[in-house]
Regions:
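Short substrate-entry loop that stabilizes the transition state in hydrolases
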Residues: 35-41
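Catalytic nucleophile-loop/oxyanion-hole region of alpha/beta-hydrolase
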Residues: 66-91
Length: 248
């Protein structure tokens, strides 16, 4: 059975997280995507990987996601970044970190570099989606949609079989978290993995992330016919292989 914990960050707010602690070991920190949670295949696969390889593991659900408290419509990149930092400070403490950022999780991970940079020893991005709120949502909204979201503060956006409530405050906050024009100087292993048939986020975003890093130890892996989530067994196998290369 998976052992979940809760971190109380205020009298009304708590963040659910999943932890495996191995003595003196580096932590793999998995950050999930937009409107996702820890019930998916990727966090479970990386938890098993950590157990097998005697590495510590941490994953969390941002406020308004999964079983963490709060409403999704009240959340934004700044709040979810802060949630992540608080849980890392509480759980990881002085151990080194290798980030795995899935989709929006890559954006949240990139934000951590200015906050806890000395502890970060590697980064694996999966279908990375930094700045997606402006570039992949707002810029594709019709004028009618833009007027509606400004007037009502929220719009329901259809994506496949799902409908997302997108708030104007979320869009505006995303603009305060621009990361693609920044530079990260640490010489760490950085690997971006992206599916060639990702219909949500174009491969160019993984390339943009690599440009942020001045490290010479960086690479892009494009998975032929891969989708956005890369959660099938054959793709999880590739992700675990790339993670092992980052660790070693």
């Amino acid at each position: 059975m998976t052992n979940f914990n809760y971190l109380k960050i205020s009298t009304t707010r708590k963040i659910r997280y999943l932890k495996l602690h191995q003595k003196n070991a580096t932590y793999i920190v998995f950050l999930h995507g937009f409107m996702s949670d820890l019930e998916g295949k990727k966090p479970q696969a990386f938890l098993k990987f950590a157990k097998k390889n005697k590495i510590s593991f941490l994953a969390l659900e941002y406020s308004g996601h999964g079983k963490s408290s709060g409403k999704f419509i009240n959340g934004n990149i700044s709040k979810w970044t802060r949630d992540t930092t608080l849980v890392i400070q509480k759980v990881v403490k002085k151990n080194d970190i290798i980030f795995i950022g899935s989709s929006m999780g890559a954006w949240i991970a990139l934000n951590q570099f200015s906050l806890i940079k000395n502890k970060i020893k590697g980064f694996l991005g999966i279908g990375s989606a930094p700045e997606f709120l402006d570039k992949l949502m707002w810029n594709k909204f019709s004028n009618k949609m833009k007027i509606e979201i400004k007037k009502k503060g929220v719009i329901n956006l259809k994506h496949g079989d799902y409908e997302y409530p997108i708030t104007y405050q979320l869009i505006k906050d995303g603009r305060k978290n621009k990361i693609l024009s920044k530079k990260i100087s640490q010489n760490i292993n950085v690997t971006m993995v992206h599916g060639s048939k990702d219909k949500s986020v174009p491969v160019i975003y993984s390339k943009k992330v690599l440009k942020i890093f001045q490290s010479k130890k960086k690479k892009l892996v494009v998975i032929k016919n891969g989708d956005h989530s890369l959660s099938s067994p054959k793709w999880l196998k590739i992700l675990k292989k790339e993670l092992k290369l980052i660790i070693n």
